[in-house]
């Protein structure tokens, strides 16, 4: 999957609810952890939009119990034709307690499936230097480095924009955003500073992360700012 321009993913745990045509969105983030039988859903998917498969662990804000089955399913998803990219948590690749993601990373690489290596903080915003370290490590491990944090003030939001610009200007492919009320506006602003991937719910009221805009609203905001 190419990230020459900003791409917007519609997030859902139900591939049957995925947009039938690419209006306002460019791909579907399939939250496998929210689906009853995610691999069967991928096999049955016949939509035109490529899929970003995410099987988010419960320790990173998702619903999947940690363990080999979670990673096995993500690795199998990476081998599925409709899947263009997979999301693997940074912690699943580097932290001693949770580092079981290597199988999914290897499966993605073997099939030329794009890897998004992600780091989330649902409680706050690390320091600017800490965010730079997290994002830099994520970029070094995957094709795209994703960082999502929760600003507590406008200074935190500004730091998200700063780290986005720093790594984008250095030629890295990044996906960055602030979550929650104080970070919401960054979802529209970071694409101006080089963020290449954003997220929105398939339908209003079905957000998968705090502060998401509806797809049409987010695309309109980004277009107006550009």
UniProtKB/Swiss-Prot annotation:
The active site is at residues 120, 146. GO terms for molecular function: 3-dehydroquinate dehydratase activity. InterPro entries: Aldolase_TIM (IPR013785), DHquinase_I (IPR001381), Type-I_3-dehydroquinase (IPR050146). It catalyses: 3-dehydroquinate = 3-dehydroshikimate + H2O. It comes from the Archaea. It holds the Pfam family DHquinase_I. It is an enzyme of class 4 (lyase). 3-dehydroquinate binds at residues 29-31, 56, 187, 208, 212. Involved in the third step of the chorismate pathway, which leads to the biosynthesis of aromatic amino acids. Catalyzes the cis-dehydration of 3-dehydroquinate (DHQ) and introduces the first double bond of the aromatic ring to yield 3-dehydroshikimate. This is 3-dehydroquinate dehydratase. The gene is aroD.
């Amino acid at each position: 999957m190419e990230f020459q321009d900003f791409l917007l993913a519609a997030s859902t745990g139900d591939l049957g609810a995925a947009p039938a045509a690419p209006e306002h969105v460019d791909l579907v983030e399939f939250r496998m952890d929210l689906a009853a039988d995610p691999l069967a859903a991928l096999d049955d998917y016949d939509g035109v939009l490529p899929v970003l498969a995410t099987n988010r662990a419960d320790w990173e804000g998702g619903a999947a119990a940690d363990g080999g089955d979670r990673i096995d399913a993500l690795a199998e998803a990476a081998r599925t034709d409709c899947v263009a990219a997979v999301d693997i948590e940074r912690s699943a690749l580097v932290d001693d307690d949770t580092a079981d993601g290597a199988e999914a990373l290897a499966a993605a690489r073997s099939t030329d499936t794009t890897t998004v290596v992600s780091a989330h903080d649902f409680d706050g915003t690390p320091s600017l230097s800490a965010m730079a370290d997290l994002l830099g490590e994520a970029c070094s491990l995957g094709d795209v480095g994703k960082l999502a944090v929760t600003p507590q003030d406008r200074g935190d939001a500004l730091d998200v924009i700063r780290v986005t610009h720093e790594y984008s200007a250095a030629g890295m492919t990044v996906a960055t955003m602030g979550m929650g009320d104080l970070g919401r506006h960054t979802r529209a602003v970071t694409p101006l500073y080089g963020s290449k991937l954003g997220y929105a719910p398939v339908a209003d009221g079905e957000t998968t992360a705090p502060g998401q805009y509806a797809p049409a609203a987010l695309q309109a905001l980004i277009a107006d700012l550009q």
